[in-house]
Curated annotation (Swiss-Prot):
Protein name (record): Inositol 1,4,5-trisphosphate receptor-interacting protein
Family, as annotated: Belongs to the ITPRIP family.
SMART domains: Mab-21
Species name: Danio rerio
Topology, Cytoplasmic side: 93-539
Cellular compartments annotated: Cell membrane; Nucleus outer membrane
Regions annotated as coiled coil: 32-68
Amino acid sequence: MQGAIARVCMVVVAAILNHPLLFPNENTTVPEQDEDLLARMKEHQEKLEAEQKRLEQEISQNETSVIGDQDGYGWYFWSALCLVIFFTIEVCRQDLISAEIPDPAEDEDGDCSTGYHSAKSIALDRGTLNNFCKTRFFPYTNESGRVREFIEGFADDLLEALRSICDLKADLEVEDFAGIGSMFESWRVSKPPTCDLIVPFSPPQPLRFQFELWCDPSTEIPLDLQGCGRIQLIKPGGNGTDCLCGSIDLGDDMLCLLHNRNECEVLEDDALPELLCARDTTYLSKGQIMRWFQISVSKAWGKISHKYDFELAFRNLDFPGALKIKFPSGKTVVLNLTPAVQFENTDAYLISHFPSDTSNSSDTHWQLSLSVYEKNLLKHLAKSLPTNSCHIHCLQIVAFLHKKQTTLTGRSAFCNYHIKTALLHLLLSKRPAMWQPQNLDSRLRDLLSFLQQSLEEKKLYHALVGNPRIPVEILVPKIIRTAEPINLYRPLVLQRHVYAKMEEHFEEMVRNTSVLVQEYTPHFSNGHVRHEFSSAEQI
């Protein structure tokens, strides 16, 4: 018995020691071995395994014949010991192989990323950053307030004129606008000033809108349209629960006690659905709405243009609310009016498009905008931050770098909304004390690193959708708060060349960060900082 056990141990040890990967030659990997040598080694290993199997069968037969013998206990001991030795050597061999044989994928990544710059290692001087912020962004503080006041007054006047030219009986009703974006969140970084306004509209009574969001289990919205929804124009009685006057003909001698005659005429008129909805459907068409909005804005401006001494022009005919105001002095203000539908008496809106996004080509899928909640979240979080916290400066610096990099290498899918989303995630995850003004350089690296990592992982989740960290005071609708998180990069990842361009853009921006900050920081002269902005250039 002991002789058989010894023979088994010798076979096991021989198989391990003769394994070609246990003691590889220095600087030699398996793919580099001669094929014939590998074939012979494999044949030798198969012979050893066959011999081992034969011996095991022999031992098994011997064990059966002497099962009553006390020496059988010794077999179990030696068998367990051999198993432990074999397992230990095998584990050590795997560690040795992992250390000796380089990963081809890692080599490939290393070769491709020879110019890779980690955002965590960017050289940033705290004093230079402070001077940069004081001279680049501080001049906009007071001026932005005046621009907002002017834009709000002008928008009120323009929308009031728009309402006056609309048919109250058979046309969309325009509601009060909501200001969003950098101008209304106090992080403007460049000129000319850009003001973004959401302009909600609603159908005439008794028509109403019904929503089908992507996160509703009863809807069938494609995965590449996450964050979108459809808007259905509903007549009373159209879903079997409302008044039937919208679905049957009452005749001339009958009246509906719930709706007056004008409302009934609206229900009988099929012109409005044809004007607003996609062909052969009851779903709102973005193209139809944008066409209606452009015509209405043009008529409204024609009605009030005599009151103003500036020019108003459409910057982009594809986006009807993309306006440009030009004063006689040459100063300009960019104004984006975006038609939208308010979602069930909340501050969430379904909008026709984002100014920086053209990826959604579906005519009936409207994009969800939570910009009002994001603005409120920034204000809410700022209350718990230290005085003169550095979070806004971090956002401004990265947005400034992005704008300058766009000037150098052209446009990409990367946008300021990605930057703001990353900042909101950091504000929700870091302690308020970490945003002290003296921590500007560290938090700036954190923001750049967060964006860099998100691009590498191809994941940047929406800051509000499905995020349990959002304070309850923000009052995000439950259906959105409990939905699955949305990856903002997903539509871009599906377009490889677009995503590759975005990654290249950001890597160049990280590489140029220190140089751009130094270049656009005014020099000191006689102990004072030289301001490069004149009052005429600030707008």
